[in-house]
């Protein structure tokens, strides 16, 4: 009889769509990319609304300058591409303002992709140190989460490093977010890379989140040595899983204890050979080795 692993080892493995902006311009090219992702052991994608709808050239130019090119894939039929590739959609990323203005349309779009998770990508033009702004954000998140729950969906908040800003009370913004949002309506997609980038211990925060951590954004962090160093201080950046210095094995154990539903690979720069697909495939090898399942 084939031995079965514990249920918590059956975490889905996915790729964040932001990694695909430079390789998903045309239908056939994109289908080949998705097939390679599937063949590398991934179960699904995490889609971004701004990448599955046409966006102005100015917006695409700004994202490229920022190091996160969204590409020209917004004109493609992503429903067909997902179906043919055999991948699933883990969640749908959007911004809070769009969700509030287009709630019904976004709910229907999520359901059309057979996902029950809407993720807020973080706040822009926002003072992370101001308690009044944070209180307003919490009210908005709770309200949006309640509406989504009534439609059978759930709301998650995705962090970067700004959430570790200390506010007027001396607490970190993320502390207040955890304390004041309603677990019934608001939960979290935890990005361990960004908290490590800010000097925090991702493992401690994952333990603090507990079962409110529904999805895990992951990439490794380290130094890609390419030439003789002029000084002993080199720049650390995102790396393929298992090639950097983060305690990914320990994080994986905590994610399993928390009952995390999916681990989502995301890096938007410093890819091996500057190739996102090679990066995805290399990280996929680590994921397959680490998240073993038996049927």
Residue locations for each model-derived region?
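Conserved beta-strand positions
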Residues: 15, 47, 92, 120, ...
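N-terminal pre-domain/capping segments
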Residues: 2-117, 187, 285-295
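Aromatic-rich peripheral "rim/lid" segments of glycoside hydrolase catalytic domains that contact
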Residues: 269-295
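Tryptophan-centric aromatic hotspots in well-structured domains and transmembrane helices
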Residues: 18-20, 42, 93, 157-158, ...
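Acidic/histidine-rich catalytic cores of soluble enzymes
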Residues: 45, 148-245
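H/E-rich (His + Asp/Glu) clusters that bind or coordinate divalent metals
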Residues: 244, 251-252, 262-266
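Active-site acidic/histidine proton-transfer and metal-coordination neighborhood
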Residues: 75, 88-187, 277
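Acidic-and-aromatic substrate-binding clefts and catalytic sites of carbohydrate-active enzymes
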Residues: 20-28, 47-73, 94-103, 125-135, ...
């Amino acid at each position: 009889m084939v031995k079965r692993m514990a249920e918590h080892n059956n975490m889905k493995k996915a790729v964040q769509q932001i990694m695909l902006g430079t390789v998903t311009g045309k239908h056939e090219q994109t289908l080949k990319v998705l097939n390679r992702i599937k063949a590398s052991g991934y179960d699904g994608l995490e889609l971004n609304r701004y990448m599955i709808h046409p966006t102005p050239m100015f917006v695409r130019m700004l994202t490229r300058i920022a190091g996160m090119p969204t590409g020209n894939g917004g004109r493609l039929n992503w429903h067909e591409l997902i179906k043919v590739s055999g991948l699933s959609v883990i969640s749908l990323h959007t911004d809070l303002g769009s969700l509030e203005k287009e709630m019904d349309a976004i709910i229907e779009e999520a359901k059309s992709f057979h996902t029950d998770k809407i993720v807020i990508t973080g706040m822009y033009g926002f003072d992370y140190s101001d308690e009044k702004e944070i209180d307003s954000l919490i009210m908005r998140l709770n309200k949006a989460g309640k509406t989504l729950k009534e439609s059978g969906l759930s709301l998650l908040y995705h962090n970067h490093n700004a959430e570790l800003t200390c506010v007027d009370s001396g607490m970190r913004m993320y502390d207040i977010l955890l304390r004041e949002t309603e677990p019934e309506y608001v939960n979290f997609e935890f990005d361990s890379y960004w908290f490590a980038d800010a000097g925090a211990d991702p493992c401690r925060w994952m333990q603090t989140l507990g079962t409110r951590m529904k999805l895990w954004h992951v990439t490794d962090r380290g130094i890609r040595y390419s030439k003789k160093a002029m000084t002993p201080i080199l720049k650390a950046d995102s790396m393929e899983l298992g090639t950097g210095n983060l305690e990914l094995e320990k994080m994986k154990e905590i994610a399993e204890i928390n009952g995390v539903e999916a681990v989502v690979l995301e890096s938007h720069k410093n890819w091996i050979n500057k190739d996102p697909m090679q990066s995805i495939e290399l990280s996929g090898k680590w994921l397959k080795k680490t998240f073993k399942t038996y049927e």
